[in-house]
C-alpha cells in the first residue's frame, strides 16, 4: 500500500550545521506522529520541509506516492500547516480571520460564533487580534482545524500558551480527525494522552 506521506533520506543544513541527515519517515491515514527533540534539533525545520515550505538539502518527500514538486497545488489543498507563530492577521478580529481563511481556502460554512465560543473566545469575537493574549491568539489560529477538510495536519507546538481546557479541546479535535482517517504530525513539549492508539514518536538528536 502506498504511504500517505513518506520522506526518504532527508538532510537539512542550516548555517553550516547539519540538523539531520538520511532521515526516513512514513505516515499513514489515522496516524499521529509526534516529533520530539531539544530546541535547535531541527523540529521546526523538518515540519517546514514536510509542509513543502522549504527544500531539503538531500532526499525527497512523497505524498500519496508522488513527489511534492509535481503536485504542489494538490498538496497545498490537502494540507493544514500551522507554524510556531500564530499566522493570524493581528489587525483583523477573530471573526474576520475566520472569514478570511474560509474565503482563501474555500472552506465550508460553519457557525463562527459557536466555534469561537467553544474555544473560550466568547465575547472576544470582534476584538482586534493584536489586543488578545498569546493564548487567545493561538486559539484563533487553531480554529482553522475545526474548519478545514484537509486530511493532513502539520502543527508546530500547537499547545503553546493554551490552558488545560483548551488543550483538552484540541486533543478531542485530534481524536475526531484521526477517526476520520486524517493524519497529524506535531511537535510539542506537551505529553500527549496515551489514549491515542495510533501515536508514534520520532526523536531528533541535537547535532553539534
Predicted regions and their residues:
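Helix-to-loop junction immediately C-terminal to a conserved catalytic motif
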Residues: 51
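Conserved ABC transporter NBD signature motif
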Residues: 55-70, 74-75
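Conserved ABC ATPase signature
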Residues: 100, 128-135
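Catalytic Walker B motif of ABC-type/P-loop ATPase nucleotide-binding domains
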Residues: 153-157
